UniProtKB/Swiss-Prot annotation:
InterPro entries: Exonuc_VII_L, Exonuc_VII_lsu_C, OB-fold_nuc-bd_dom. Belongs to the XseA family. The gene is xseA. This is Exodeoxyribonuclease 7 large subunit. It is found in: Cytoplasm. It catalyses: Exonucleolytic cleavage in either 5'- to 3'- or 3'- to 5'-direction to yield nucleoside 5'-phosphates. NCBIfam families: xseA. GO terms for biological process: DNA catabolic process. Its main location: cytoplasm. Pfam families: Exonuc_VII_L, tRNA_anti_2. Keywords: Cytoplasm, Exonuclease, Hydrolase, Nuclease. The keyword Ribonucleoprotein does not apply. Its EC number is 3.1.11.6.
Length: 397
């Protein structure tokens, strides 16, 4: 109906407030429970706890709000394609969707979004093996981040009890819904800030749909996991389920119970391994001692043989010494005999010897020995020496 086809008297008149209230009532009565499919954008989380966002498709955008206290199975994240359940309301002359429920839509797009995020973080080096921390050999204290109720925590505690009893600290969190990833982040930070932190952390939840596991694809959670000073083992879902936290964690376990088996050795197996290693150590020590003993015996044999050789050399040296002394004495005796003979010969030509046997020695007046008659002339004075005295004489002819 156009304005020209009706009488102005027939057009109802409203105040601004009246028409606003009427539109609000019409929208509430008509769209009191609807589903809207769209992509989340413009996400805002003020301190009030309310969540403000927009839902968009290729052509249009609608504002939406989720009041603080509304429990959802999926957390808000820009880029997610979701189906929101709620009702339309007006606010400041505009209408908006009040969200009361939300599920993920378009799993193909979710998978593409997840792969894009994984590649981004991988390119940053967040998943590098060099960043991974080794697990302790035998942790005395284990931190577990999971729901305080349900099968997962029971399975973990039961497996710990039967495998190797250890001190378990449970940090209770939601493992599904819009608050899950933030609670897990706070739990990891909380464990790292304890004065006596656990030796290792297990982050666990049971299996579920991609929507159920989506909180563990959160980028902030991945960064917090990689930055943890305490080694983290992720155990999210079943063996075929992979989430971003699995790449960021130091070790990924296929199931929560498998995480316990990775973290803790089996008690009996540990005892057996220790006994086996002790046996190997004893055997190695025996082998080393045996080899050293054999070497000592060899050295003792060498020393004994050397001692015998030294004794033989000593005896030989003594024999040579005695022989040398004997030869020296013989040589000395011969020299003594030769010397005595020489002295005897010299003595025979000695003046005193000659005189003693009846000969005399003649000297001229200068005291020189006269050995020839031609050495003196008539009237020369000479001195004649006998053994018992001297006499002066003159040469007559």
């Amino acid at each position: 109906m156009s304005l020209r086809s009706c009488s102005t008297e027939m057009i109802p008149e409203f105040t601004v407030t009246e028409i606003t209230d009427l539109v609000r009532q019409v929208m509430h009565d008509t769209f009191y429970c609807i589903k809207i499919r769209g992509e989340i954008s413009g996400l805002s989380r003020p301190s009030s706890g309310h969540v403000y966002l927009s839902l968009k498709d290729d052509n249009s955008v609608i504002s939406a709000v989720c009041w603080n206290g509304t429990r959802l199975d999926v957390q808000f994240e820009n880029g997610l394609e979701v189906i929101c359940t709620g009702h339309l309301s007006t606010y400041q002359s505009r209408y908006q969707l009040v969200i009361e429920g939300m599920v993920l839509a378009g799993q193909g797009k979710l998978a593409a979004m997840l792969e894009e995020r994984r590649k981004k973080l991988e390119k940053e080096g967040l998943f590098d093996q060099a960043r991974k921390k080794p697990l302790p050999l035998l942790p005395l204290k284990i931190g577990v981040i999971t729901s305080p109720t349900g099968a997962v925590i029971r399975d973990i505690l039961n497996r710990v009890k039967h495998r190797f009893p250890s001190h378990i600290i449970v940090w209770p969190v939601q493992v599904q819904g819009s608050q899950a990833s933030a609670m897990v982040v706070q739990a990891i930070l909380g464990f790292n800030n304890l004065e006596e932190p656990p030796d290792v952390i297990i982050v666990a939840r049971g299996g579920g749909s991609i929507e159920d596991l989506w909180p563990f694809n959160d980028e902030e959670l991945a960064r917090t996991t990689a930055a943890s000073k305490i080694p983290i083992v992720s155990a999210i879902g079943h063996e075929t389920d992979f989430t971003i936290i699995d790449y960021a964690a130091d070790v990924r376990a296929p199931t929560p119970t498998a995480a316990v088996e990775i973290v803790l050795p089996e008690r009996q197996q540990l005892v057996s391994d220790i006994a086996h290693k002790l046996s190997k150590i004893r055997s190695a020590v025996r082998n080393v001692l045996g080899a050293k003993e054999h070497r000592l015996l060899q050295l003792y044999g060498v020393l004994t043989e050397t001692k015998h050789k030294i004794s033989e050399v000593g005896r030989s040296a003594l024999a040579h010494q005695e022989k040398i002394e004997f030869l020296f004495k013989v040589a000395l005796l011969k020299k003594q005999q030769y010397l005595d003979n020489l002295i005897g010969r010299i003595d025979r030509y000695n003046k005193e010897h000659i005189i003693s046997v009846g000969y005399a020695v003649i000297y001229d007046n200068t005291g020189q020995h006269v050995s020839s008659a031609n050495a003196v002339a008539p009237d020369d004075t000479i001195v004649i020496e006998w053994k018992d005295g001297k006499r002066r004489a003159a040469i007559l002819t």
